[in-house]
Amino acid sequence: MKFIEVKNLKIEFTKIDESGREVPGKTALDGISLDIEKGSFVAVVGMNGSGKSTLAKCFNGLLAPSAGRVIVGGFDTAEEAHIWDVRCRVGMVFQNPYNQIVSSIVEDDVAFGPENLGIEPKEIRRRVDDALKRVGMYELRDKGAHMLSGGQKQRIAIAGAIAMRPECIVFDEPTAMLDPKGRASVMSIIRDLNAEGITCILITHFMSEAEQADRVIVLKNGKVLCDRTPEELFSDKEMIERAGLEMPPAIEIRDKAGLPEHLTTADDIADYIAKQ
């Protein structure tokens, strides 16, 4: 079942010329068409400037199309009357965890979104407790947000998105500023959320994260270069080179060891070796 439909999407930014007039500037997305299935886990990758984060902002209406359409759960993101419907269905978690905290106390920060929906206090309490437990931060619910590490702050940002009860969460490079331990924690949470039926869209430049998705969309110069399963993509070295990407470490180990191509993650490889 289609949850997000992107039809010939174009995003153009304008600039001011020397005479002070607004003129066409960069075309960030150029004719993007794709569908996101409900309950899927999709990774979007590409070099810097490929259009990844711009596309992410289109999924919940932060950016309106210059041309084309983005339909979310049946609602057109270009129609202002439907923006609230879109944003209730699609939550977002951004790259910088330090810029996403709006309250001084952990549980107050997670409650911020539901409070703005006008939800009853008892229901907010249930949602906040549930969200914090799901990201492993319940024990720190009454702590000062300023005392948290970057990884902990990112988990709080994810809890805030969960508390809104969206059908989909877009993660825009959520691990870019985290250490390996923080990255692993966030990826574990994303996999768990997807296992519960939440549609997850991961924007990332880490191929080791993309390989954990059901599907990988590769962008280059604002266009879709390819749309494949991780197994298909990481078995095509020529495509990886065209996209300006690097093979995940697990794939490099697999190839050097002469292991079967269907093994795409470190866990796959470990399980295969253990059974030999």
Describe these PLM feature segments:
Residues 122-140:
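Conserved ABC ATPase "signature" region
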Residues 169-172:
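Catalytic Walker B motif of ABC-type/P-loop ATPase nucleotide-binding domains
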Residues 68-78, 86:
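Conserved ABC transporter NBD signature motif
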Residues 60:
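Helix-to-loop junction immediately C-terminal to a conserved catalytic motif
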Residues 240-276:
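ABC ATPase nucleotide-binding domains
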Residues 144-148, 152:
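Conserved ABC ATPase signature
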Residues 45-47:
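The feature captures the beta-strand-to-loop junction immediately N-terminal to the Walker
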